[in-house]
A protein has these predicted regions:
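NAD(P)-dependent Rossmann-like dehydrogenase/reductase catalytic/cofactor-binding core
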Residues: 50-54, 60-71, 89-94, 99-166
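Segments forming oxygen-rich coordination pockets for charged ligands
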Residues: 85
Length: 166
């Protein structure tokens, strides 16, 4: 079995370059891997049921929960979280609330462990921007067009925890 952790390369395209496309699958681990109990198990066009079952067994062996996802740009987690992060940035850019108020509102109001802006900071604003641009190009949906504030922060070198400036 060839498993890839990519969230932007096509499992089907990778499989097409092998002689056993039925044995290629995506295992999308979310960051930080030790703390996140979820893995998206991504079926390419030719992924066999046997390969899928073995991948799910492997994920369980790691003590994680696997969810079946069919290949599509962004899978489930990335597709759903990016508009959320983007909208939080728009709220700050429009002066509706401070970053701290946005994160506190979402954490306490919805029982989240981390607010959307702190999450973007952990992921890295450059990565969030790259993912948004990829989904915007692939899907053409305006909800994935990066907020101007995100691009401004990146240009200023404020890309997140990894560089000490978010």
């Amino acid at each position: 079995i060839l498993a890839t952790n990519t969230s932007s390369l096509s499992v089907t395209e990778i499989a097409a370059r092998t002689r056993r496309s039925d044995r290629v699958i995506g295992l999308h681990f979310l960051q930080p891997v030790p703390q996140v109990p979820l893995v998206e198990v991504v079926r390419g066009l030719g992924t066999s049921d046997a390969t899928f079952r073995q991948a799910m067994d492997f994920v369980r062996l790691l003590g994680k929960t696997g969810v079946e996802v069919f290949e599509y740009p962004g899978y489930v987690t990335t597709r759903v979280i990016l508009p959320f992060l983007n909208e939080a940035m728009h709220v700050v850019m429009e002066g509706v609330a401070t970053p701290e108020a946005v994160d506190t509102s979402m954490r306490l109001g919805y029982g989240l462990q981390v607010g959307p802006l702190a999450l973007a900071d952990r992921i890295g604003l450059d990565e969030v921007n790259r993912w948004m641009q990829y989904l915007f190009e692939e899907l053409g949906d305006l909800k994935y067009r990066p907020c101007p504030l995100l691009r401004k922060m990146i240009r200023a070198g404020h890309i997140g925890v990894k560089c000490g400036r978010g």
